[in-house]
């Protein structure tokens, strides 16, 4: 085969003006910094989000917002959470559901109180009254809410921003008082002296959800011998039976027999009132070779001997129950106590098998002490300082100098067996980042035991995504103790109780609760601090107001946020209770999910949600937590607007941030960083450029005038619609399952593999070269119009700004002014032609195989454009043979279409092998031969045709192009 040269380049006329070139106002660059706010202003001006949420015909969908804390700048965790919620809400809106998303903020608590205090000098702090502090805290919270709200709005989040819920709002506080009151009247609230997690740095009790367990905590652990001064006769008899005689006199006995205990909190030893054993464990009296006997768990005897570096030989073995009643003397104080039977918490996993018991400083200790009638001794004040009850250790701080002084005293007394450092999980105050302690105080508790079974039943009725969430919260609720809900702070919702000044009797009844609730509903919680008892007490007690004092405790902030269902989803218009969905980080199984569940079940016997969906945490690209010290913090606003160095931190816009959220499997922790953002930006550009190409080819297309009926479309166009239908089905399923990473993958593959690299690549010729009204061009435009409308709608929940920009640049009337008014994309049944799927897949694979051979020719510089090539095919597989026969049965036009699909100038199927080949490939699919195409290059369409030069008016054009020019 030969290929001839056409006219010299400088003699060729230009046919550029005869081609159908792209025309669109949809730019290649998003210019997101300017364009996104314009689109957001358009939505607000038209009221599209709120009107759609109110006027949609479908049922209500309520995604109840877990309130972020009103303090600090927004971070990637906020972005992950709020964008996920927005994607879901926008999808439900487009499905026709009524959606009113009410954003919330958690506004009470210590961090805000500390911020207020930090902004004041010592003199100002001393002059600060509780009500002044509350006013300043409220002002600070409102300012923080305003800043965070502006950030959320810039991300394209749709919400009822003018009517958010804040836990400091009076209607919210009143609803919370109602929740507390109902629980109290049902018997679920009580006051008691009990060990609680206490933060000396905050000087308040903490709930489990307010604790964190940082890595690397080390405690000074000690093994201590308590001298035994008396044995029960029953134990003495059992020891004698084993050949072990012990002295009867207590002073002699104490010199030779010790109870060995182990503790990681030496500062609690002044509060020791017992040693506890497990009645079912074996214990031995072991001789250390120096005439000293130690009582330890038999199973631990060898390991303790190794630790103490002294031989221990068991002389007698008894059950734990036999040890009960042994009397020992405190090694540091003038106090005698007894060994008692504890519980299953006493094991042989660590320590000695005998547990130092201080009922004022541990839950197990407290429960054991209560069982045996021990007093609750707590010689530690609110600052963590030992009191006079600690004897010579008074004034020492338990987290500073107390441990060292007590260890030194143990050594001086000869009771210290061993001291060593011990690394373990230890609770810290999540706000101050300082260690906490267990400390018995008078607190208010929610008794979970009263409704635990109901709560577990409610958990079973909820859909947990991922499913592991159910086991997680189920085990937490099953095992959790009573909930300490009181805090010794000023900035919060008051616990509405009164105490009889002389007796301490508590007033908490339906009248007092109703009266306080009504006052707070009208005036807000500040009234508790502004008014005296005479105004706060119900009418039945006003005459004796002088006998009562109001409480000073406030409620745990988890009780605040955990009551949101009562104030928001069950009371506000356009919402539903239980809510359809709660969506927060996986840490909220122990936080908001649980506090909301407990309050809702306690009050109404039902969970406040139907489905709970959790996400992981945002990490850097190396999988590390973000921190200023590591310098790896990614700021969502820098992603959107760019950093100081725009080359290193370019402005990507909100849609790239949103695309990141859709791209990750958020059920686990998710990475984000500069490299990931660059990759996402590339994907964003591909989607945008694909959309631009579709729009640019529709500038002269009006569907009502130019559209071709589906049944009259060529095979490739019908296949493209069939493929679009399949992809849209898969995208819809991904949204329904909240698997947005599948949407991301489907979108990327559809825009790149199906459209850009296949359909649109093939369509260029008929789009550019055909006469404007040619059926082959109008057919392609028909498909492009149908696709761009549905593509815009399908990406709208995620790429909301791009979708709206596409919609506003569709050059023909769409019937709706916003993509969000167009509804979730659906496809007519006539698009679904399964007969096209298999043969077209074979032909796509054939195209890939041909492209591979053509690319080899290009790489060896045997070819420039693929249009310089002619290709002969010979099918090898039955499937491809069937596909080619199927194609031939559709007529010559479709066979010629295959040539266009391959982007070559000539195509031969079957026949004799060619000579003068550029390349060939005999693979499993087909024999592929490539030669130079015959004829000359058309100056307009660039195809090589044999009829070039036969048309005097256009000697450089092929017959097809001459015909087009005659019709233009």
UniProtKB/Swiss-Prot annotation:
Gene Ontology process terms (BP): isoleucyl-tRNA aminoacylation
UniProt motif ('HIGH' region) ranges: 68-78
Compartment(s) where it occurs, according to its Swiss-Prot or TrEMBL record: Cytoplasm
Primary location: cytoplasm
Cofactors demanded by this protein: Zn(2+)
Gene Ontology MF terms in the entry: aminoacyl-tRNA deacylase activity; ATP binding; isoleucine-tRNA ligase activity; tRNA binding; zinc ion binding
Catalytic activity of the protein: tRNA(Ile) + L-isoleucine + ATP = L-isoleucyl-tRNA(Ile) + AMP + diphosphate
Motif 'KMSKS' region boundaries: 625-629
Protein keywords: Aminoacyl-tRNA synthetase, ATP-binding, Cytoplasm, Ligase, Metal-binding, Nucleotide-binding, Protein biosynthesis, Zinc
Positions of L-isoleucyl-5'-AMP binding: 584
SUPFAM superfamilies: Anticodon-binding domain of a subclass of class I aminoacyl-tRNA synthetases (SSF47323), Nucleotidylyl transferase (SSF52374), ValRS/IleRS/LeuRS editing domain (SSF50677)
Keyword set includes Acetylation: no
Domain of life from the UniProt record: Bacteria
InterPro entries listed in its UniProt record: aa-tRNA-synth_I_CS, aa-tRNA-synth_Ia, Anticodon_Ile_BEm, Ile-tRNA-ligase, Ile-tRNA-ligase_type1, Ile-tRNA_ligase, M/V/L/I-tRNA-synth_anticd-bd, Rossmann-like_a/b/a_fold
Residues that, per the record, bind ATP: 628
A GO cellular-component term linked to this record: cytoplasm
Chain sites annotated for binding Zn(2+): 938, 941, 958, 961
Free-text note on domains in this protein's UniProt record: IleRS has two distinct active sites: one for aminoacylation and one for editing. The misactivated valine is translocated from the active site to the editing site, which sterically excludes the correctly activated isoleucine. The single editing site contains two valyl binding pockets, one specific for each substrate (Val-AMP or Val-tRNA(Ile)).
Family, as annotated: Belongs to the class-I aminoacyl-tRNA synthetase family. IleS type 1 subfamily.
NCBIfam families, per database record: ileS
Purpose: Catalyzes the attachment of isoleucine to tRNA(Ile). As IleRS can inadvertently accommodate and process structurally similar amino acids such as valine, to avoid such errors it has two additional distinct tRNA(Ile)-dependent editing activities. One activity is designated as 'pretransfer' editing and involves the hydrolysis of activated Val-AMP. The other activity is designated 'posttransfer' editing and involves deacylation of mischarged Val-tRNA(Ile).
Subunit structure: Monomer.
Protein name (Swiss-Prot/TrEMBL): Isoleucine--tRNA ligase
Organism ancestry: Bacteria, Bacillati, Cyanobacteriota, Cyanophyceae, Synechococcales
Gene transcribed to yield this protein: ileS
């Amino acid at each position: 085969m030969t290929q001839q040269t056409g006219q010299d380049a400088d003699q060729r006329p230009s046919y550029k003006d005869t081609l159908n070139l792209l025309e669109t106002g949809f730019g290649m660059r998003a210019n997101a910094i300017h364009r996104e706010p314009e689109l957001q202003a358009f939505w607000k001006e038209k009221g599209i989000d709120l009107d759609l949420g109110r006027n949609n015909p479908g049922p209500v969908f309520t995604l109840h917002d877990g309130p972020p804390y009103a303090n600090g700048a927004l971070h990637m965790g906020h972005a992950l959470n709020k964008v996920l919620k927005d994607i879901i809400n926008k999808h439900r809106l487009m499905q026709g559901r009524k959606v009113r998303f009410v954003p919330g903020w958690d506004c009470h608590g210590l961090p805000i109180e500390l911020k207020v205090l930090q902004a004041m000098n010592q003199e100002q702090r001393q002059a600060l009254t509780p009500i002044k502090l509350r006013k300043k805290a409220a002002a600070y919270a409102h300012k923080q809410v305003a800043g965070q709200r502006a950030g959320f709005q810039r991300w394209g989040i749709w919400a009822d921003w003018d009517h958010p819920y804040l836990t400091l709002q009076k209607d919210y506080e009143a609803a919370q008082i109602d929740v507390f009151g109902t629980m109290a009247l049902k018997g679920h609230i009580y006051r008691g002296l009990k060990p609680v997690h206490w933060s000396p740095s905050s000087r308040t009790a903490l709930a489990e959800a307010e604790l964190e367990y940082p890595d690397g905590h080390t405690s000074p652990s000690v093994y201590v011998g308590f001298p035994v001064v008396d044995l029960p006769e029953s134990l003495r008899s059992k020891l004698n039976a084993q050949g072990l005689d012990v002295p009867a006199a207590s002073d002699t006995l104490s010199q030779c027999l010790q109870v060995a205990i182990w503790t990681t909190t030496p500062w609690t030893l002044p509060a020791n009132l017992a040693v506890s054993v497990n009645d079912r464990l074996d214990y031995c009296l072991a001789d250390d070779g120096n005439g000293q006997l130690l009582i330890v768990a038999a199973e631990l005897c060898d390991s303790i001997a190794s630790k103490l570096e002294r031989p221990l030989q068991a002389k007698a073995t008894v059950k734990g129950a036999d040890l009960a009643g042994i009397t020992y003397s405190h090694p540091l104080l003038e106090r005698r106590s007894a060994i008692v039977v504890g519980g299953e918490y006493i094991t042989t996993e660590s320590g000695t098998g005998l547990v130092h018991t201080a009922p004022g400083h541990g839950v197990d200790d407290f429960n054991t002490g209560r069982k045996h009638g021990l007093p609750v001794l707590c010689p530690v004040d609110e600052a963590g300082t030992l009191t006079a009850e600690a004897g010579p250790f008074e004034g020492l701080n338990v987290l500073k100098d107390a441990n060292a002084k007590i260890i030194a005293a143990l050594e001086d007394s000869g009771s210290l067996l061993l001291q060593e450092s011990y690394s373990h999980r230890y609770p810290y105050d999540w706000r101050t980042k300082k260690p906490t302690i267990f400390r018995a105080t008078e607190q208010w508790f929610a008794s979970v035991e009263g409704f635990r079974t109901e709560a577990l039943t409610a958990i079973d009725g909820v859909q947990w995504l991922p499913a592991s969430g159910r086991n997680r919260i189920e085990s937490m609720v099953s095992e959790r103790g009573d909930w300490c809900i009181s805090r010794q702070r000023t900035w919060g919702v008051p616990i509405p109780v009164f105490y009889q000044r002389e007796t301490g009797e508590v007033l908490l009844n339906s009248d007092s609760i109703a009266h306080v609730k009504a006052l707070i509903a009208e005036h807000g919680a500040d009234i508790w601090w502004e008014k005296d008892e005479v105004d706060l007490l119900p009418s039945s007690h006003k005459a004796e107001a002088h006998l009562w004092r109001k409480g000073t405790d406030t409620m745990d902030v988890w009780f605040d946020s955990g009551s949101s269902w009562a104030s928001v989803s069950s009371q506000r218009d356009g919402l539903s209770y239980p809510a359809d969905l709660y969506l927060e980080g996986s840490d909220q199984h122990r936080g908001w999910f649980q506090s909301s569940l407990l309050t809702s079940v306690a009050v109404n016997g039902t969970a406040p949600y139907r489905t709970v969906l959790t996400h992981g945490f945002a990490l850097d690209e190396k999988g590390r937590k973000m921190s200023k010290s590591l310098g790896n913090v990614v700021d969502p606003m820098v992603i959107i607007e760019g950093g100081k160095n725009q080359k290193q931190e370019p402005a990507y816009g909100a849609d790239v941030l949103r695309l990141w959220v859709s791209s990750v499997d958020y059920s686990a922790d998710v990475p984000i960083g500069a490299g990931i953002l660059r990759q996402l930006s590339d994907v964003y550009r591909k989607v945008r450029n694909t959309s631009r190409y579709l729009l640019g080819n529709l500038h002269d297309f009006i569907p009502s005038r130019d559209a071709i009926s589906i049944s009259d479309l060529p095979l490739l166009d019908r296949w493209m619609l069939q493929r679009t239908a399949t992809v849209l089905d898969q995208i819809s399923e991904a949204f329904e399952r909240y698997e947005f990473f599948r949407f991301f993958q489907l979108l990327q593959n559809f825009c790149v593999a199906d459209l850009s690299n296949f359909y649109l690549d093939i369509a260029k010729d008929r789009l550019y070269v055909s006469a404007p009204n040619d059926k082959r061009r109008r057919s392609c435009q028909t498909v492009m119009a149908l696709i761009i409308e549905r593509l815009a709608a399908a990406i709208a929940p995620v790429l909301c700004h791009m979708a709206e920009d596409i919609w506003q640049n569709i050059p023909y009337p769409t019937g709706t002014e916003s993509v969000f008014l167009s509804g979730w994309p659906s496809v007519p049944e006539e698009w679904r032609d399964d007969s096209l799927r298999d043969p077209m897949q074979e032909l796509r694979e054939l195209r890939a195989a041909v492209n591979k051979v053509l690319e080899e020719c290009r790489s060896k510089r045997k070819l420039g454009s693929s249009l310089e090539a002619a290709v002969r095919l010979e099918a090898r597989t039955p499937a491809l043979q069937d596909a080619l026969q199927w194609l031939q049965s559709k007529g010559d036009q479709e066979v010629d279409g295959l040539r266009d699909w391959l982007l070559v100038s000539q195509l031969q199927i079957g026949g004799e092998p060619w000579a003068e080949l550029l390349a060939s490939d005999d693979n499993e699919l087909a024999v592929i031969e490539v030669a130079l195409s015959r004829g000359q290059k058309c100056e307009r369409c660039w195809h090589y045709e044999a009829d070039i030069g036969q048309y005097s008016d256009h000697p450089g054009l092929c017959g097809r192009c001459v015909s087009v020019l005659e019709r233009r």
